Regions:
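Basic, amphipathic alpha-helix used for nucleic-acid engagement in HTH/winged-helix/SANT-Myb modules
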Residues: 1-16, 69-73
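Short, amphipathic alpha-helical "recognition" segments used to contact nucleic acids or chromatin
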Residues: 11-28
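Short Lys/Arg-enriched helix C-cap and helix-to-coil transition segments
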Residues: 55-73
Length: 73
């Protein structure tokens, strides 16, 4: 479920790969993904959990993966 905090059109393949690494390889929580993205790309959302979830959903979908299945969740 998305919360409209991220416009999927703004997520590049490079950003999606970085988000995937944080979530899937480094086991970041949605809050940690949100904070890392805010720090790296500049966002006022900070560690907002809904923002982190939306980033993961947008990234997974761009990569052709299901954001609610392994390895995302």
């Amino acid at each position: 479920m998305t919360h409209n905090t991220v416009d999927p059109a703004t997520i590049t393949p490079e950003m999606a790969a970085r988000i995937r690494t944080w979530r899937c390889d480094e086991d970041y929580s949605w809050r940690a993904v949100a904070q890392a993205a805010s720090d790296l790309w500049g966002s006022g959302w900070g560690s907002n959990q809904l923002f982190g979830e939306d980033l993961c959903v947008a990234a997974a979908e761009l990569l052709g993966e299901n954001p609610y299945r392994e390895p995302w969740n």
